[in-house]
Amino acid sequence: KTKKTTLCAGNIATAEAAKFLIKLGVDIVKVGIGPGSICTTRLVAGIGVPQLSAIIEVKKGVKNKKTKIISDGGIKYSGDIAKALSAGADAVMIGSLFAGSLETPGKLIKKNNKLYKSFRGMGSVGAMNKGSADRYFQTKQKDTSKYVPEGVEGFVKYKGNVKSIIYKLIGGLKSSMGYLGAKKITFLKNKPNFVKITKAGFYESMVHNVDEVKNESKY
């Protein structure tokens, strides 16, 4: 490592891994093993930690303010961004929420009079055929039928311009900060109070007892 180079390494899910990387001189650690919507690592390898728990655990290993934490994956709603930042992340990486936007490279496809965009995980066969096999130590495997994928390919609804998506995500984050009285994003980390909820509590948190939702929000 040189002073002019910023190093980012991952993905990890434990405090021990964070300490190990920091000793090597890493400036940024990425947290997340299997939380992505198109990732199958937890099914294929049996490895992974629920994302919020992983962030909290990694934060225990990051004692200095210079080392930053990026939460990679698991963002389904704007509220998940607030939770990740409150748990200790300095930033989040978002994939699936942006996958259906105009700016993404996926092909625009029409199915049943609805528009979709193709979306694939870096561990999918399609992505490995395009060069991501090295991430999974499978570059020596010339027979692509023998790839062991840790991701899938699929389609997501077309969402239009990415600006509208970002606008709603920022709005949700601001709303969360307002509820918590946090004037700055950094204030979210001031002893957050996380509460475990039951399945009934989760159901109550979602839209319910409604047959049809008009002007559905993307949260």
Regions found by a protein language model. Give the residues of each.
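Non-cysteine beta-strand/loop elements that form the S-adenosyl-L-methionine
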Residues: 26-35, 94-95
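Alpha/beta catalytic cores of nucleotide-metabolism and tRNA/nucleoside-modifying enzymes
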Residues: 2-3, 8, 24, 46-71, ...
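Phosphate-binding glycine-rich loops and their immediate beta-loop-alpha structural context
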Residues: 1-4, 14-16
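Short amphipathic alpha-helices and their capping/turn segments at secondary-structure boundaries
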Residues: 15-27
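Glycine-rich beta-alpha junction loops
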Residues: 13-14, 35, 96-101
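Short acidic loop-to-helix transition motifs that present clustered carboxylates
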Residues: 12-17, 76-78
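Gly-rich Lys/Arg/Thr-decorated short loops/hinges at beta-loop-alpha junctions or inter-strand turns
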Residues: 35-43
